[in-house]
Amino acid sequence: MTQEELQIGSEYFAFESGLYETMRTMNYKLVFLEPHLERLFSTAQKINLKIHHSLEEITEMLEKVINNFPDPNQRIRILSVPNKFIIYTSHLNLNPLIYNGVNALTVEAKRDTPEVKTTNYHVCLSALNKAIEANSFDAILCDKEGNIYEGSKSNIFWVKEGRLTTREKDVLPGTTRRTIIEKSQISVHYGIL
C-alpha cells in the first residue's frame, strides 16, 4: 500500500463505517496512547465496526511499527475499515509557524458525527481544501450565524473574561482537547464564540 492510498481523502477514507486514530511519538514513545485506544474502541462500538484485535495486540503492533521507523518523532495512524486494520507511520513534520500563530478562514460546515473520529471525513477535508487554496493553515468550521465549532484539523479555544473557553458539544472530544481542559491553569468555561 502506498503513502497516497493511506491519506485522508483516499478510497480507504471513503468508507462510511470506518474509523481512524492519529497519534504521535516523542523519542519513540507514544503520546497519550491510552486515551487514543479508548476512543478507538469506543468509536468502533458506536459505529458497529468490529475490531479483531485486543488492546494488547494493537499496542504490540504499534510498538513494532514505531521501532522499525528511523525517526524518533512520528505521526502514527490507525485505520480500521470492514475487514482491514492498518497501522502506518510517517515523519512528524510540524509546521514551525504553529508556534507563532497561523492564518485560518471560516467555512460554514459541521461534522456529521462530531463525537466520533470516522473515515466519513468529507466535511473536514472539503473545508481544509478551501483553506489550503486560500493559503491558510486550517479552516474553522462554523454555523450559519458564524458561531465556531472547531478547526477541520484542530481544536478551538479562546480566552474570554480570564477564562479558557471552548464549545461543550458538537465538536470532536479529542485527546489533546481533553488534556488542555484538564491541565488548564485558568478556569475552563463552555460557551459559543
Predicted regions located by residue number:
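Helix-start/capping segments and mature chain N-termini
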Residues: 1-67, 81-193
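Short secondary-structure junctions
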Residues: 67-74
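Dinucleotide-binding Rossmann-like beta1-alpha1 core, especially the glycine-rich loop
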Residues: 77
